[in-house]
C-alpha cells in the first residue's frame, strides 16, 4: 500500500485524546485549542488565530473572508482535495486549474502567472 499521508506519532497522542474526550472538549473550545492558538499567535506575531475543525471549514472561511463572488476566478492546483474546489465554487467562483509539479505534487509555480487574469481574486496553493 502506498500511503497518501502518514502523520507523525510522538507517544502522547492517546493521553491527550483521552483528556479531551474525558473533559468533553473535542470540538475546538478546549485547553489544547487555546494552547495552539497562543503558540501560533506568538510564533507568527499574529493579532488573532482561529483554529478550525477541518481544512474544509478553513477553506469555506477563506472564501468568505476573501469576498469571493460570482465571476471571480480562483487559481488552484489540478491535484487537490475536492474541498479546495468546493469551497470556492459554493461562493460562486470560476475555478482555474494549474498543473502540478510531479516532483512535489504541488502547484507548478512557473505556470501560475500565465493563469492570472483581471478576474483572478485568489491563488489557493495546496501543500503536500
Q: Which stretches of residues belong to each language-model region?
A:
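A generic local structural motif
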Residues: 3-5, 13-14, 36-37, 60-63, ...
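N-terminal "arm"/small-domain region of PLP-dependent enzymes with the aminotransferase-like
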Residues: 1-26
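Short alpha-helix boundary/capping motifs
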Residues: 10, 30-31, 52, 78, ...
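Phosphate-binding glycine-rich loop
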Residues: 29-73, 87-90, 97-99
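PLP-dependent aminotransferase-like
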Residues: 64-128
Amino acid at each position: 500500500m502506498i500511503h497518501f499521508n502518514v502523520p507523525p506519532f510522538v507517544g502522547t497522542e492517546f493521553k491527550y485524546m483521552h483528556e479531551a474526550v474525558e473533559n468533553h472538549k473535542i470540538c475546538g473550545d478546549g485547553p489544547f485549542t487555546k494552547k495552539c492558538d497562543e503558540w501560533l499567535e506568538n510564533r507568527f506575531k499574529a493579532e488573532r488565530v482561529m483554529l478550525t475543525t477541518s481544512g474544509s471549514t478553513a477553506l469555506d472561511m477563506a472564501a468568505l473572508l476573501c469576498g469571493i463572488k460570482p465571476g471571480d476566478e480562483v487559481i488552484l492546483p489540478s491535484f487537490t482535495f475536492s474541498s479546495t474546489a468546493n469551497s470556492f465554487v459554493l461562493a460562486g467562483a470560476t475555478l482555474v486549474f494549474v498543473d502540478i509539479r510531479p516532483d512535489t505534487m504541488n502547484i507548478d509555480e512557473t505556470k501560475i502567472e500565465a493563469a492570472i487574469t483581471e478576474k483572478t481574486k485568489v491563488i489557493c496553493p495546496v501543500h503536500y
